[in-house]
């Protein structure tokens, strides 16, 4: 689409090259006509770049702001004091007014203005060499004028012609310090324009006034509310004040109001009388007043350190619509390969939409500005998906302004901004953690000076992690370039820190001497993990274990294999040995394995070769007879369970979660089974014991039990056997004979109304809830 837009613009520029003169005799001078297809080409031009007609106002305000920027720079070295013919000085602002009777919208700025030659150059010909330069810069991804402030000229380029989206006729009056005369450029967008001295004389002193005769279907732009809404959307943070003239009803007074100053020279809050105003019977009159619209100044352009925390909070609420203060903010400026200003905020609540996996939905939390002009908030990857909860603004002078979103999306500059923005965002999170640690160590600064970021008054990282930890863990899977930065931000509870989170670095710092790696267990909750038999082994060895309680952790550890040079080890995997064996122990282990080899072969045959990959002697210090672990290079039982819950198509995924049976030879039941199976491989008691222990171990490890009914029957048989009851003993006979019921009692019972027992239970439950 971007190439298509470029092709159209190139075609327009080529067709508009060269102009011809035709005669006219209406007093406006000689009209200048472009080639015959100009109207069609202009239509292609504006519609190829703009789909929303309201952007014409953004373009004109941006042009006016550039013109004011230019004159401000020029006056730093060569100040002047121009005046209108009535002796009024032009103002350094933009003003928008209306003539509803004529359906005219009027925009005026006190900027640099244009001479007759500049009007012809910038408005009269799209086919100049400037257009070629514009197209070249467009292709390079650099906007005309770039980041050089001396090029901040109020030249009307491609964007100006968006005015014909809403206007039937446009008149541009302009006065430059370089000319004694004020000129008017006028066109209906029909292939020709007029250029003539303004018959009104010097009404501007300096600057430009654009009068748009609105199309019948664009008269909504005669509404002050519509104009203000559009300004808030696109031009809220323009460097200069923007005033809109409004009609307000005020109580009439006996005193005669002073004559209003000429339009464009009024101060904020000044009153301009409607010459045709009439008081009603209740003493109310209509007056015209200038209303300042863009009261929220672009605080990101102010020096970092000169903005208070309260101002940042106020700004956040204004631009985000969130009524809460942000959890954290960071204001920074990037210079070098690309220059931009940015303020990023971390909200105090999670937007459920941030967990959406629909990549076609743009992230609208980051608003992109170019020279303080809002461009778009619909980039899908200005920040990666895992950081889509961060809100903020980015303002760059190095991006092109008047191009489509598709062209910007491919911009090299935008890719650089994205890379730096991600680094700054992760640095912001690290700062929250660092301040947390400082507070914990008693190093909190009581009354810090403004520094462009939040100064925490109390710990906040725990809340941040609980809100956005899932997002950061997703980042480990999606952003390999920043994986190390992300893992430093991770926080977990552990067997030594069940109530407070610790970082992986903290875990590493307090590892036992000689410890092989970072041990962890995953589960639905800390309470469930604490009941795991494999945790018992770590506790017995005084080894700390990380508790991972979020489903996403299982996916994360598949990507995150180590941290700070220490391997991450899942205690639920086979063959975990927390202490090294000496030579004597290794020899004994080999002999022990030979002793139990036939026993293990029998167990594997009993439970099924397809279900149990292998049977081994456990090296864990545990009181359990059997442990079921996952294969070393296989997915865990928990991950398989999570995958089954996420998609029915993965219902058979459990087959890849291979089971390893670990046998504790020191357990009395294991010793009894070994003896019984050595005598008789079909021993029923030993078989029942083996199955019950195996199924129980499966449940503890979150593997499913294949035959729950058989499991229940085996437990029943073992319980009968433990109290010397035969498995064949049937139920006892009914004991009705023990209870004597008289005929009278039976008759009385028959006469009682029948009551639904379930209804009684439900009624009791409701009553308990009420209590």
Curated annotation (Swiss-Prot):
Q: Which SUPFAM superfamilies match?
A: ATPase domain of HSP90 chaperone/DNA topoisomerase II/histidine kinase (SSF55874), HSP90 C-terminal domain (SSF110942), Ribosomal protein S5 domain 2-like (SSF54211)
Q: Where is the composition biased (Acidic residues)?
A: 260-277, 758-771
Coiled-coil spans are none
Q: Where does motif Prevents secretion from ER map?
A: 768-771
Please provide, alphabetically and separated by semicolons, the GO molecular function terms listed in this UniProt record. Answer: ATP binding; ATP hydrolysis activity; ATP-dependent protein folding chaperone; heparin binding; unfolded protein binding
Q: Known InterPro entries for this protein?
A: HATPase_C_sf, HSP90_C, Hsp90_fam, Hsp90_N, Ribosomal_Su5_D2-typ_SF
Q: Where in the cell is it found?
A: Endoplasmic reticulum
Q: Which residues of this chain are annotated as glycosylation sites?
A: 63, 306, 402
Task: Give the keywords, sorted.
Answer: ATP-binding, Chaperone, Endoplasmic reticulum, Glycoprotein, Heparin-binding, Nucleotide-binding, Signal
Supply the Gene3D superfamilies for this chain. 3.30.230.80, 3.40.50.11260, Heat shock protein 90, C-terminal domain, Histidine kinase-like ATPase, C-terminal domain
An example of a Gene Ontology cellular component annotation for this protein is: endoplasmic reticulum
Q: Where does ATP bind?
A: 63, 109, 160
Annotated stretches, region: Disordered: 253-282, 727-771
Membership in a protein family: Belongs to the heat shock protein 90 family.
Q: Please, what other remarks does the record include?
A: Prominent antigen during human and canine visceral leishmaniasis.
- Protein purpose: Molecular chaperone that functions in the processing and transport of secreted proteins. Required for the synthesis of lipophosphoglycan (LPG), a cell surface glycoconjugate. Necessary for the attachment of the galactosyl residue to the mannose within the phosphoglycan repeats of the nascent LPG chain. Also required for addition of phosphoglycan to acid phosphatase. Not required for normal growth. Has ATPase activity. Binds heparin with micromolar affinity which may facilitate infection of host cells.
Name it.
Answer: Endoplasmin homolog
Task: Show the taxonomic lineage.
Answer: Eukaryota, Discoba, Euglenozoa, Kinetoplastea, Metakinetoplastina
- The gene name on file is LPG3
């Amino acid at each position: 689409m971007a190439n298509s837009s470029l092709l159209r613009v190139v075609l327009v520029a080529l067709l508009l090259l060269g102009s011809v003169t035709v005669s006219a005799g209406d007093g406006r001078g000689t009209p200048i006509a472009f080639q015959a297809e100009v109207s069609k080409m202009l239509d292609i031009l504006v519609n190829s770049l703009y789909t929303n007609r309201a952007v014409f106002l953004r373009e004109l305000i941006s042009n006016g702001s550039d013109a004011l920027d230019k004159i401000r720079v020029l006056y730093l070295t060569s100040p002047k004091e121009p005046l209108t013919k009535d002796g009024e000085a032009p103002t350094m602002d933009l003003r928008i007014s209306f003539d509803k009777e004529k359906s005219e919208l009027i925009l005026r700025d006190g900027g640099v203005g244009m001479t007759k030659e500049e009007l012809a150059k910038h408005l009269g010909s799209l086919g100049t060499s400037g257009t070629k330069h514009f197209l070249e810069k467009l292709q390079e991804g650099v906007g005309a004028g770039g980041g050089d402030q001396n090029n901040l000229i109020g030249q009307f380029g491609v964007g100006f012609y968006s005015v014909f989206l809403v206007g039937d006729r446009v008149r541009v009056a302009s006065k430059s310090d370089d000319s004694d005369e004020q000129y008017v450029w006028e066109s209906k967008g029909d292939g020709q324009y007029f250029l003539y001295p303004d018959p009104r004389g010097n009404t501007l002193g300096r600057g430009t006034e654009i009068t748009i005769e609105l199309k019948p279907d664009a008269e909504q732009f005669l509404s002050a509310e519509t104009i203000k809404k559009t300004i808030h959307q696109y031009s809220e943070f323009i460097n200069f004040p923007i005033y809109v003239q409004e009609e307000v009803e005020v109580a009439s007074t006996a005193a005669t109001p002073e004559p209003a100053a000429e339009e464009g020279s009024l101060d904020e809050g000044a009153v301009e009388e409607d010459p045709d105003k009439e008081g009603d019977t209740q003493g109310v009159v209509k007056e015209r007043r200038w209303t300042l619209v863009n009261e929220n100044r672009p605080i990101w352009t102010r020096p970092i350190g000169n903005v208070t925390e309260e101002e940042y909070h106020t700004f956040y609420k204004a631009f985000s619509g969130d009524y809460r203060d942000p959890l954290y903010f960071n204001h920074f400026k990037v210079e070098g390969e690309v220059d931009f200003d940015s303020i990023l905020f971390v909200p105090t609540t999670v937007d459920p939409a941030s967990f959406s996996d629909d990549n076609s939905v743009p992230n609208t939390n980051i608003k992109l500005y170019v020279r303080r002009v809002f461009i778009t908030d619909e980039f899908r990857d200005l920040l990666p998906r895992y950081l889509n909860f961060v809100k903020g603004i980015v303002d760059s002078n190095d991006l092109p302004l008047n191009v489509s979103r598709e062209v910007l999306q491919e911009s090299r500059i935008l890719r650089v901004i994205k890379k730096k923005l991600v680094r700054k965002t992760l640095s912001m999170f690290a700062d929250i953690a660092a301040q947390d640690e400082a507070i914990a160590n008693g190093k909190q600064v009581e009354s810090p000076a403004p520094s462009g970021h939040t100064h925490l008054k109390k710990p906040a990282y725990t809340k941040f992690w609980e809100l956005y930890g899932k997002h950061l863990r997703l980042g480990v899977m999606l952003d390999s370039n920043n994986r190390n930065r992300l893992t430093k931000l991770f926080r977990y509870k552990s067997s030594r820190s069940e109530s407070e989170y610790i970082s992986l670095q903290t875990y590493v710092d307090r590892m036992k001497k000689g410890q092989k790696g970072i041990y962890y267990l995953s589960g639905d909750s800390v309470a469930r993990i604490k009941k795991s038999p494999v945790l018992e082994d770590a506790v017995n060895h005084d080894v700390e274990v990380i508790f991972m309680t979020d489903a996403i952790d299982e996916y994360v550890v598949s990507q995150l294999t180590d941290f700070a040079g220490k391997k991450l080890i899942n205690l639920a995997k086979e063959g975990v040995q927390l202490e090294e064996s000496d030579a004597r122990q290794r020899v004994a282990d080999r002999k022990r394995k030979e002793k139990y080899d036939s026993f293990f072969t029998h167990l594997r045959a009993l439970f099924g070769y397809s279900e149990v990959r292998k049977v081994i002697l456990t090296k864990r210090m545990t009181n359990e007879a059997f442990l079921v672990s996952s294969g070393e290079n296989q997915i865990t039982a928990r991950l398989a369970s999570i995958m089954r819950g996420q998609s029915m198509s993965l219902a058979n995924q459990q087959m890849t979660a291979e089971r390893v049976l670990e046998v504790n030879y020191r357990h009395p039941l294991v010793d009894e089974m070994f003896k019984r199976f050595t005598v008789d491989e079909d021993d029923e008691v030993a078989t029942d014991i083996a199955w019950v222990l195996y199924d129980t171990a499966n449940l503890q490890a979150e593997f499913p039990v294949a035959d729950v009914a058989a499991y229940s029957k085996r437990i029943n048989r073992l319980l009968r056997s433990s109290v010397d009851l035969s498995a064949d003993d049937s139920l006892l006979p009914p004991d009705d004979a023990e209870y004597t019921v008289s005929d009278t009692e039976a008759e009385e019972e028959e006469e009682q109304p029948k009551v639904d027992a379930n209804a009684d239970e439900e009624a009791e439950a409701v009553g308990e809830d009420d209590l």
